[in-house]
Structure formats: C-alpha cells, structure tokens
Amino acid sequence: MPAGGAGTTAGAAGAGGSSALAPAGMRRLTPTEYWSSVSDLLGLDASTPAPVTEDVAAISGFKNVAASTLTLSAQGVQEYSDAALSLAGLVFGDATKRAALVGCTPAAASDPCVRAFLQAFGRRAWRRPLAAAEVDRYAGIVTSLAPMADVWTGLQYAVAGLLQSPWFLYRVEVGEPDPTRVHPLRFSAYEMAERLSYFFWDTTPDDALLDAAASGETLAPAGLDAQIARLLASPRARAGVARFFREYLSTDDLATMTKDATLFPRATPTLAAAMRDEIEATTADLVFTRHADLRDVLDNRQTFVNAELATLYGLSGVTGTMLVPATLPDSGPRAGLLGTAAFLALDARTDRTSPTLRGKFVREQLLCEPVSPPPANFAATFDAPGAAPAGKTLRQRLVQHMSDAACSSCHALMDPLGFAFEHFDALGAYRATEGGLTIDDTGTVDGQAFTGPRELAAALRANPAVTSCLARQMYRYATGHLETDGEAPVLADVGARAQAAGNAYVDYLRAIADSDGFRYAGGLR
C-alpha cells in the first residue's frame, strides 16, 4: 500500500480548514509504555519486578488518550526518580549486565567510551539524537563523581538522570511546519519513529527505526511503508496488538475482579488469569496466524483454554494449566468476543448478571454510540435490599424499571442488547434457566431481531457501523486522542483502504499508520 495514498485524506481534511486534524502536543508515557521502554533500554528480563509509578485512568478505554491530558504530581515525580535510580543500580551493580549495556569498558570519566555510550543510550531513551550540550551535561555527571566513585557509578547516575528527563517520560510530538502547507504541522522524522514504535510495539524505537528517521525514511512514502512492514513482521508486534485489546476490553481489570464466593466458588484468580490469557491468545491467532477478517472477532469459534476455563465452557478433554487450542461447538451458545468469559464476567455484578453493563459495552465499544451517565440526582434503588421480587427474572424487573421515564431513555439503548446474554451467569458460565425461571434472550438491534448472543453477533457483523467503530477504536489507540469531527474523512479513508486490502486487522494497522491523522497535526495544543 503506497504511503502516498494518504494524500486523499489530506485534501479532504484540508478542505474543512487547516485545523481539521487534531492538534499536536506532548503526553506522558503510560505505565505500560514506561515499563516496556525501560526494560528494552536496560535489557531487563521478565523476572524484574516493575516499579510503582503513577497510574493513568483511561478515557474511552485507553490510557494513552488520558495521558495526553495529565501532568505529573509531586508523588509521581518522586516515584519516577526512585524507579530510575533503582533500575540503574540494578544494572550497573552487575558486571555482566553493565558490560552488555555499555558495550565498552571505560578506563576513566574522560574515556571516549563514556560519551559514545551516552550518545547511543540517550538517542534511544529520548527517541532523538542528543545535542552536544546535552551529552556534555550527562558526561559531566560522570566527571563530577570521578573523585569519589568509579566510572561505572558515574554512568549509573547519568543513566538514572536520562530516565528522569521529560524527554524520556513524555512523548514530545509537537511537529514541524508541513512543507506541503496542507496542514499546519507534520510530525518530524523522529516523532514518526516514536509514533510507529509505540503503536506497533508498545515500546521505544529500536536503532533501525531511529536510523531510518535519521535518513528521513520515516517521512518518505517508500521508507514509511518499509518500516511499517518491518515492524509488523516482527514478533514484537504482538505486544502492541495485545495492549490494544487489553485496554479496549479492560481485561487488566480481571486481576481485581471479585465475585460472590458463595454463588461462584469457581471464581478464582487462576480462572481470571485464564480469561485474560484467552483473549490475548485468541486475538493474536486471529491477527497474526490466520490473518482473519476484522469482523471474525465477533463469531470466531477457535479459541484457547486450559482445564479450568474449559470446565466453565463445558468443553471436555482439556487438562493442565497451559492454554491449548479448542473449537467451540457449532451448535453451542458461545462464540466470538461476546461469548468469552472475560467479557461476560467483567460486565456483570458480583452476584448477578447485568444486561445494562453488557448492553452498554455493545452500544459504546462495538457501535461507538456513547450512553449518557445517570442524572446527578439518580438514586440506585434497583439493587437495594428487598428490591428483587420473587418469581421475576432480571429481565422482567429491568423492563419494569425502564417504565420510569428518568431511566428509560438510556436503559432502552443498553438493556435490550444485554438481554441477549442472560443465558450466561455473572461468571460467564451457561445456565438453562434463571433460578428455575424461563430466560428470554430475544431482542432487536437497529430493527433486526435476534435470539441469543450468536444471532446478535451475526447482526453486528453485518452492520457497517461495527466495522467503522472497530477501526475508530484502533485509531484512538494509535493516535492517543479521541477523533475530532474534522477527522471523519481520515477515518473514512482508513476504512476504505483497509477493506480494499482485505479487511484484516493488519490492513487497518497499515492504513492508520499511513493516514494523515497519524502523520500530520492541526496545530499545537
């Protein structure tokens, strides 16, 4: 796909005014971006415990969207300082690790090895070359410590300093004048390297990508295409895809999910971990092994389970704690994302199902139709003690609840979709009845009738709005912002190009990375 194809959206976006695209700016690394970057820079292995750093509350599911609106608190600054000093000490306190990191053995602070290392490490850490004065500043740390410590200690503190700099802790993507004058700004060659690396790999750029930026390749159509292909071909691309789905589906929340132990004795931490791992393994299989259509995530029957999760799903013949491939029965009630225990358990209460939460997910995350929050004077009486009359299903109670004019407008958008999942309990296990009562899992979506989650999934698959919404979610993750009204032509072009290329997930990744919304900005924040 030629990178130059983005010119279509340049004209469309530009027609609406020079500020049609989102503005450029700087944003903090998310905790995951920080940890993956530090691990890559210092050569840390998976056994190294991640330091405590200030977390970010997601906006529309994505932490990198929220990170663009936040500054660091005093506590956050201290946490990053402590982390940098601790991790640098861990590496430089080990002769083997520090030798592997530095790549030469400095005899003194004045040894050329010192500056060479600081230039190379600094470029990767700050994702751009250091100016001579910046190298001087950090080399000065090594020199100043020479009378009281060896050169390795000086380098340790210099590295800790580089990792505390705003140039590392923030993604500084402020752009430069666009020579075509279609947009106010284009992202620079090094900023493009940064954007590509965090989008595809969820970490700091490698030397090959920074070298491509140094030669201007990340701004040239052929060079950009080559880097996109290289990044996607790497096994490291799985990290970026995994992070997208973990945030989009909130599967990190499974680690702290609680269920009523009396009602759901199978709700163990190991089962929750298997739910999370199923999502990661299944999406990786769809994206990288099967190169499946984007919509296959809705009705896919090929999954991965261990013994604990297989038991929950009613699958036989699976033993052990490791995930293994499994095929969900064609005649069964479960398939695709909306049949996973991760979705069904997360979007439920501790003691019962929640058609409202499940329907809200479908409405907002698959159809991109935001639901307004409850009014400020909302009183939560639905789950109050004594509020559940005997002999009524949850659906019957919610239908009665929707007769309240203050509740009906929003619940009507969510509950009818969520009723499709009532054959699955709050842990995601199938149930034939609800306490002996007949379950009604029929409904309609955009005027189309369905019975159960598989028919709902089929209706969603056939709905072009769902494909557009999935692309929009990827675009938000890639760019770190909620799309502006002026970016509608960009999103339309991304969808058209990806569908023409085959409609696979990677087709959307390529189209987004090659779009005007990823490469250009409408000014500064």
Pin down the residues of each PLM region.
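Ser/Thr-rich, Pro/Gly/Ala-heavy low-complexity intrinsically disordered linkers and tails
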Residues: 1-21, 25
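Active-site substrate-binding loop specific to GH73 endo-beta-N-acetylglucosaminidase modules
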Residues: 19, 29, 39-465, 471-476, ...
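GGW-centered surface loops in extracellular recognition modules
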Residues: 27, 34
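Axial heme c-ligation environment in periplasmic c-type cytochrome domains
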Residues: 478-483
